[in-house]
C-alpha cells in the first residue's frame, strides 16, 4: 500500500455553513391607495426591493395589478362576489396611487347561478368611454318562470335569445359610451345596467340574476397624472363663515364728509 497524503482528511467539510441573510432587509413597504369611488381608500401594502444604483424601487411598482374583493373596498359583505383589479400608476413618497383596471365575479357565485331547467344568455361587446378607455364588457342573464306557470322548465327559444343578446349589447353601448370610466364603475357596482336589461327584456322573456360578469380593459389612454390625482383627491369644503356687513354709524360718515370739505 502506497504511503501518502490522505486527500479526504485534508479537504474541508463539504457544504459548509452559509451566511444567513434576512431577505426583508433589502425590501420596503408601500401603501396602496384606491380611487375615491370606493369607501376604503388605503386597502393594503405592497413589498418591493429598495433602490439600488440605477434600479429604482418605483420602477418595480408601476404597472403592478392588485386584485381586491369589493366587500373589503366598500365594507359591504353583500358585494363579496365581485373582484376589482387596480393598477399602480403613480408613486409619491411611500404611497401608490391606483386606477381601475378590471372587474369580475367569483367562480362560486357563477356556479351558484347556473341551474338545470333555465337558459343562460350571455352577451359581450367592446365599448369606448368618453375618456378613451377601450373596454370589453360581458353580461349574463338567466330565464325566469312566468307567473302561474305549471311547466317545470323555462327554456327560451333561439329567436328570443338573439333578441335578448342584441338588447344587452345595445344597453351596454348606450350606458358606457356617454360616461367617464369612474361613472361607469359606479353604474356597474350596484348593477344598474343589469336592472335596465331586465326591465327592457321583460316583454321578450322574463329574466333574473342579470349582471355584468366581467369588465376587461383592452386599451388605456396615456397617463395624465393630474386626472389620476383628481380620482384620489377629496373635495374640500370651505369652512369659512359668512360675515354680515355692519352698517356704518352716522358719526363716522359726518367725520369723513367734514375732512373732504377741508
Curated annotation (Swiss-Prot):
The keyword Ribonucleoprotein applies. It is found in: Cytoplasm. GO terms for cellular component: cytosolic small ribosomal subunit. Residues 234-262 are annotated as: Disordered. Keywords: Cytoplasm, Ribonucleoprotein, Ribosomal protein. Coiled coil: none annotated. SMART domains: Ribosomal_S3Ae. Pfam families: Ribosomal_S3Ae. Residues 234-251 have a biased composition (Basic and acidic residues). The keyword Ribosomal protein applies. GO terms for molecular function: structural constituent of ribosome. GO terms for biological process: translation. HAMAP family: Ribosomal_eS1_euk (MF_03122). Belongs to the eukaryotic ribosomal protein eS1 family. Component of the small ribosomal subunit. Mature ribosomes consist of a small (40S) and a large (60S) subunit. The 40S subunit contains about 33 different proteins and 1 molecule of RNA (18S). The 60S subunit contains about 49 different proteins and 3 molecules of RNA (25S, 5.8S and 5S). This is Small ribosomal subunit protein eS1. It comes from Plasmodium yoelii yoelii.
